[in-house]
Amino acid sequence: TEMMGEEDGYLAESINKDIEECNAIIEQFIDYLRTGQEMPMEMADLNAVLGEVVAAESGYEREIDTDLQAGEIQVRMHPLSIKRAVANMVVNAARYGNGWIKVSSGSELNRAWFQVEDDGPGIKPEQRKHLFQPFVRGDSARSTSGTGLGLAIVQRIIDNHNGLLEIGTSERGGLSIRAWLPVPVTRGQVKEG
């Protein structure tokens, strides 16, 4: 094989990068479509799932603050999907924030929630409704890489859990995304008609 010049090397490298990005988009799109299918649900501890993601996503480059409700939060869920949703939210916060990320959880009556906050530029209220559409990225996202599918996948996963997503402003002025999940009523609780 003939020797590649330096320029060719750069070109090959950027082509490889493009291919990798295309593959990432295809993989995420398949995930996006797949999340619409029936998922086996089980009772699992939401805090344990959050803890796993925080441990996996924390490292020498990023530290994640946590404020998890004490004890377990038992929710009927597909744990792998919820883990994926939380991871996507954390990656989004890392991409657009300035280094501060906070993951918290809580519950009230018949629903539980988890939330991811960052200290990035935030998103204007009028843009928020588009945030979870595939391939839509906020203004501040234009300078960073990403498939534009991360939060669309989150939306699909939470929808499949009959949950709700709420967008707000974090305590540091960035973006806060809270996911609400229904908590099944246990036999010990009396349902009022």
Each language-model region and where it sits:
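Conserved glycine-rich
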Residues: 99, 162-163
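Short conserved segment of the HATPase_c
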Residues: 123-135
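Conserved micro-motifs of the catalytic ATP-binding
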Residues: 35-39, 74-77
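Short beta-strand/loop element within the Bergerat-fold HATPase_c
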Residues: 100-110
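Short alpha-helical Gxxx[C/S/T] motif in the catalytic ATP-binding
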Residues: 150, 154
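Conserved catalytic submotifs in the C-terminal HATPase_c
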Residues: 63-74, 109
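Acidic ATP/Mg2+-coordinating residue in the GHKL
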Residues: 118
